[in-house]
Curated annotation (Swiss-Prot):
Homodimer. GO terms for molecular function: ATP binding; metal ion binding; methionine-tRNA ligase activity; tRNA binding. A motif ('HIGH' region) lies at residues 13-23. The gene is metG. Coiled coil: none annotated. It is an enzyme of class 6 (ligase). Gene3D superfamilies: HUPs (3.40.50.620), Isoleucyl-tRNA Synthetase, Domain 1 (1.10.730.10), Methionyl-tRNA synthetase, Zn-domain (2.20.28.20), Nucleic acid-binding proteins (2.40.50.140). Residues 600-706 form the tRNA-binding domain. GO terms for cellular component: cytosol. The keyword Protein biosynthesis applies. This is Methionine--tRNA ligase.
């Protein structure tokens, strides 16, 4: 069977500001799907571009004292830190002001003209008498003619999704001057979406499985009778005004001086322009590529732009003689902390660059969003407590720690070489391999929530196996070498499979694991096979830190001067970076303490301790009560201020290092008989996090740290 050939896009961000978290969510969703397809052997071209045209950019550039071209170029220059920071791997990032887009937009227009679907009409258009210019749709506001929501834009309603002409607005006003606009006549060009050919095509295209069922049902309503602002009714789809008057930053319409394409005509053409630019850079033929009948064209978009992508765009392509999309995947919006709307001044904004600047792992967010997105267009919520629990307990506690529970024994006792799994281990691995098809199917349907959920259920089974085998105890018993190697081999083989299943979500971590396991880049074709007896793995390196509550607090911290204009995200990140750079003058944020003698150090008795039990301390949000076995025939009670970094159940059964000869200290909650060692940065606000020391496998309770 030939490999699939897929052309994938995300919605083009408007080039008047930095990426926000909604952009990043969409790009991560698409990136996961693209990575999965490549792991299946598909040939994928994944492209994006900046949407650069329109009066808003023209006006913003004027205010900034720049040309529109320079304004959008400066915005484009800031895209890289976001995309690289979150491991979003577009094959090409382009611009709708590029020559390819000018050329393709004009070609499509001429083809639609030749098809008899472009009509010239004289219309009355709003004109700002104070600014002496025709007003772009987005600079006219008023009451929606359908749902009567106030302060809606002149081309579509953000409340009900209605699309209309600016003159349909009730009580309009200029967003530039506040003046009441006056109507002036102007010749405009219309794409006749009401033409029976367009209607028949779209009725079939929107209902043949290219859209999610809930989206298809919504679109179906738009073919019914619509109510006009004056109370009359009209049947079916309305025609689309595709032109704007000068002054306007955009693509001039052929043979129509002073007339420009409306931004929504040339913006989706930017998908094709970016693809064309990519192929030409590779020396490939764009025309040959798009003419391939096996090519699949897929768009990822938000639910706020469904109209443009399910009516205008496919009709433009169809009747200009081009391929229509095979799928339009629609996602919902992202809210924060139980449905709150994003607001920096209320501390509910989630700034992507601030997230990265705080040292938060990009793959925490990729994992969390993947665990929420399910292939439907439902809204999802970023909840800080849920985020911390899913990352610390599931991603790290269940998955990442599997390797650390076995790798050290294999390296130290068996030269890093795998053995053969025991009978239970072999059955477990077969169960893991059997789920490859179901997990792949979930990724195909963009149901990453299910893919993650199924993988974590498998991780639970692996951890049950480890807990039953107790390799840390086998390592201390005479004559259990074979059992120890078999148990650890099963862990590593299972870890490889789990990593394979999560690789589309966690590409950076997967690359680390591939290097550690000494394997080629994992694909779904590798699921049936095992590493095999005798395979040598490398030395295990720590793969991922836990989320610290202080990082989340800093992420949602309300700005000190909420009423003041917010600094651009890039500036905030630069300031965070500068602060971090200043802190590095002292290692770990603190200067090295004065020197001591070896005799001073010898007074401190550091011992390996097994955490037998761990529980929260009632009345304290910072402390955990640890029950420690230091190999002295009794258990010790130690209080440690690590509750912000660890859940009690995560620590039980783990080894750590403690100060064993510290004088007992009477505290409010009881007596503490020692101190657990943990690392943290001197500047906790800039570098939050507490990291309990964890010795390598092979250390046993009571051993002294020398």
């Amino acid at each position: 069977m030939p490999a699939r050939k897929i052309f994938v896009t995300t919605a083009l961000p408007y080039a008047n500001g930095n990426f926000h978290i909604g952009h990043i969510m969409e790009y991560i969703q698409a990136d996961i799907w693209v990575r999965f397809q490549r792991m299946q052997g598909a040939e994928v071209n994944f492209v994006g571009a900046d949407d650069t045209h329109g009066a808003p950019i023209m006006i913003a550039a004027e205010k900034a004292g720049k040309t529109p071209q320079q304004f959008v170029a400066d915005i484009a220059a800031g895209r890289k830190p976001y995309l690289e920071g979150f491991h979003i791997r577009f094959d090409n990032w382009h611009s709708t002001d590029a020559p390819e887009n000018h050329e393709l937009a004009r070609q499509i227009y001429r083809d639609l003209q030749a098809a008899g679907l472009i009509e010239t009409r004289t219309i009355e258009q709003f004109f700002d008498p104070e600014k002496n210019m025709f007003l772009p749709d987005r600079f006219i506001k008023g009451e929606c003619p359908r749902c009567h929501a106030r302060d809606q834009y002149g081309d579509n309603c953000e409340n009900c999704g209605a699309v209309y002409a600016p003159t349909d607005l009730i009580e309009p006003y200029s967003a530039l001057s506040g003046a009441k606009p006056v109507l002036k006549s102007s010749d405009h060009f219309f794409f006749q979406l009401s033409d029976p050919r367009c209607v028949a095509f779209l009725q079939e295209w929107t209902q043949d499985g290219r859209l999610q069922p809930e989206v298809a049902n919504k679109v179906k309503e738009w073919f019914s009778v619509r109510t006009n602002p004056d109370g009359t009714t009209s049947e079916g789809l309305g025609d689309w005004d595709i032109s704007r008057d000068a002054p306007y930053f955009g693509i001039e319409i052929p043979d129509a001086p002073g007339k420009y394409f409306y931004v929504w005509l040339d913006a989706p053409v930017g998908y094709l322009a970016s693809l064309k630019n990519l192929l030409e850079k590779r020396g490939q033929s764009y025309d040959d590529y798009v003419a391939d009948p096996q090519l699949e064209q897929v768009h990822f978009i938000g639910k706020d732009i469904v109209t443009f992508h399910t009516l205008f765009w496919p009709a433009m392509l169809k009747f200009s003689g081009r391929k229509t999309p095979d799928a339009v995947f629609v996602h919902g919006f992202l809210t924060v902390n139980n449905g709150e709307k994003m607001s920096k001044s209320r501390g509910t904004g989630l700034d992507p660059l601030k997230y990265l600047g705080l040292g938060m792992n990009a793959e925490w967010l990729r994992y969390y969003l993947a665990a929420k997105l399910n292939g439907r267009n439902e809204d999802i919520d970023f909840n800080a407590e849920d985020f911390m629990a899913r990352v610390n307990s599931d991603l790290i506690g269940k998955f990442v720690n599997i390797a650390s529970r076995a790798a050290g024994f294999l390296t130290k006792r068996f030269g890093g070489r795998l053995g053969a799994p025991d009978a239970d281990g072999a059955a477990l691995l077969e169960a893991l391999r059997a789920q490859a098809g179901a997990i792949a199917e979930a990724y195909e349907r963009r149901d990453t929530a299910r893919a993650v959920r199924e993988t974590m259920l498998l991780a639970d089974r692996v951890n049950e196996y480890v807990d039953a085998r107790k390799p840390w105890e086998l390592a201390k018993q005479e004559g259990q070498e074979a059992a120890l190697q078999a148990a650890c081999t099963t862990c590593i083989e299972a870890f490889r499979l789990l990593t394979l299943y999560l690789k589309p979500v966690l590409p950076a971590l997967a690359a680390q694991v591939e290097a550690f396991l000494n394997v080629q880049p994992l694909t779904f074709a590798d699921a049936p096979a095992l590493l095999g007896e005798g395979h040598a793995i490398g030395a295990y390196q720590h793969l991922m830190q836990r989320v610290d509550i202080k990082q989340l607090e800093a992420l949602f911290e309300v700005p000190a001067a909420a009423a003041a204009p917010a600094a651009p995200a890039a500036n905030a990140a630069a300031e965070a970076s500068a602060a971090a750079g200043a802190a590095t003058e002292a290692p770990g944020g603190e200067h090295i303490a004065p020197t001591i003698t070896i005799d001073d150090f010898a007074k401190i008795d550091l011992r390996i301790a097994l955490i037998v039990n761990c529980e929260p301390v009632e009345g304290s949000t910072k402390l955990l009560r640890l029950t420690l076995d230091v190999g002295e025939g009794r258990h010790r009670n130690v209080f440690s201020g690590i509750a912000s970094a660890y859940r009690p159940e995560e620590l039980v059964g783990k080894l750590t290092v403690m100060v064993a000869n510290l004088a007992p200290r009477k505290m409010k909650f009881g007596v503490s008989e020692g101190m657990v060692l943990a690392a943290s940065h001197g500047d906790e606000k800039a570098h939050p996090g507490i990291h309990v020391l964890n010795p390598w496998p092979g250390a046993t309770p009571g051993m002294r740290v020398r």
